Amino acid sequence: DPSCVKSRTGFIITVANCPVLWMSKLQTETALSTMEAEIIALAHSCRELFPIIDLVISLGKAVGLPTKDLTTMHVSIHEDNAGALVLAETIPPQFTPRSKYYAIKTVWFREEVQKRKIKLLKIDIVEQLGDLFTKGVPKVTFEYLRKKIMGW
């Protein structure tokens, strides 16, 4: 909708390279910068990711996987915005006057990322799977990202 000024959050969560959750949703607040929109999206995706991590750990325990395997589970979040990565990874965060007012709201997710040893990885914008859920992409890009999601 061209008249809407809210950013759209889009992400996909995979377990063993299989998509288990994907979402596209308008953000409830209006972001004043791209970095702010990305931080809001990171926090929202983490709220969806953490219960899935807990579920995988519970299922692993239920089938008798060694605890060591469960505690060393590799979890990563791919982000294409460098500013959002710096703000998300740094504890205490490196605030700028513009970033301080919204970064305070996401302190919990920075702490969870550190506690759960989740890796935040910089990904090139052309590799960002979430773009399928946030914007119209050219056919070639759509087909490329679709193949990545499907594991082809």
Predicted features, each with a name:
Residues 1-152:
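Divalent metal-binding acidic/histidine catalytic loops
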